[in-house]
């Protein structure tokens, strides 16, 4: 999934989809042999799938899938979502946020302000200088990482 420098999207995808492994740049503790061992152990317990969410900053999913297939002898597929992950139908929340952020941006322009980015932070809509916004990174929560690991067992 997208996430060259940040694993926020990967972590949320992993939690939402019950992934067994989430690989993110912020907490890179990647041990390929451990993953292979877990896949084999899960298969022996009757589990028929093992989902790994890989943030793009970690490396190539396709080559990882090939190495896992070679090590386990099990059919393995890599799915590169790319821009497809942006293409879902908007939720009610998406539509409300888009309308509110669009109105906020128009208000800024009417006030003579430009080079601003509108976002949602800490429960409210805010605007930021464009250069400041480009330097921001949405961090991941250590607790969410723990939950993802606990849920994958």
Question: Where in this protein do the model-derived segments appear?
Answer:
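Catalytic, metal-anchored helix/loop core of enzyme active sites in primary metabolism
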Residues: 67, 74, 84-99, 106-110
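A broad detector of short, well-ordered amphipathic alpha-helices
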Residues: 8, 12, 96, 100-103
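Conserved catalytic/coupling modules of large nucleotide/cofactor-utilizing molecular machines
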Residues: 92, 100, 104, 108-120, ...
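Accessory alpha-helical/coil subdomains and C-terminal extensions
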Residues: 1-75, 81
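Short, hinge-like loop/turn segments at secondary-structure boundaries
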Residues: 40-42, 95-96, 135-136
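Short active-site-adjacent structural elements
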Residues: 61-63, 86-89, 124-129
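Short glycine- and Lys/Arg-enriched binding-loop motifs that mark or flank ligand-binding interfaces
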Residues: 3, 78, 84, 98, ...
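Phosphate-binding loop/pocket of nucleotide- and phosphate-handling active sites
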Residues: 116-153
